[in-house]
Swiss-Prot record:
Residues involved in substrate binding: 111
EC number(s) from the headed UniProt entry: 2.5.1.18
Domain GST C-terminal: 85-203
Record-listed glutathione binding positions: 7-8, 41-45, 54-55, 67-68
Quaternary state and interactors: Homodimer.
Database matches in SUPFAM superfamilies: GST C-terminal domain-like, Thioredoxin-like
The species this protein was found in: Fasciola hepatica (Liver fluke)
Gene3D superfamilies named in the record: 1.20.1050.130
Name this protein carries in UniProt: Glutathione S-transferase class-mu 26 kDa isozyme 7
Organism domain of life: Eukaryota
GO terms for biological process, alphabetical: glutathione metabolic process
Keyword Transferase carried by entry: yes
Alphabetized GO MF terms: glutathione transferase activity
Amino acid sequence: MPAKLGYWKIRGLQQPVRLFLEYLGEEYEEHLYGRNDREKWLGDKFNMGLDLPNLPYYIDDKCKLTQSVAIMRYIADKHGMLGSTPEERARISMIEGAAMDLRIGFGLTCYNPKFEELKGDYLKGLPTTLKMWSDFLGDRQYLIGSSVSHVDFMVYEALDCIRYLAPQCLDDFPKLKEFKSRIEDLPKIKEYMKSERFIKWPLHSWTSPFGGGDAPPA
């Protein structure tokens, strides 16, 4: 039976989960809540048997989960992709936390009502952050080596969202630019991105000063 996902009809915190499942070729069904479906979600929220009800959620025949990182870790663990030693698992966990910092740092700026005032400071600090990630990636193909892991999709998604605000941000970081292209060129990811199921926009909730609305900036 396919896993069931639930989230808003946006990219948000669910997009890395979608990308990871597509890469793995794992079947899933997704319930998408639209812009005007808040009351519908509130009606569903406490009637699904979720321990800590929230979006996104993931339900399969053995588990009901919320929280995007927990979902990613569970899927990775099912496929034997969480590392084979305490050191490897700790490193993956570290990358997860840093990837969430990258994505949420961008999101907090974009959601702020004073976005136009704050974006200058965000963009000023961005090269330092990207240099850290470029140095960490080094000469590896992917973040933990030569094999794809769930954290690659977390970092990829953050980078892809940031480039809507700063289209040239990776020009000084060719290793990150190549990493981003490498993810997009994975056959199943490329196919997914061409499909009608792929959500390109919005990045955030529809009301977000940046990354919201119905269409990307021109």
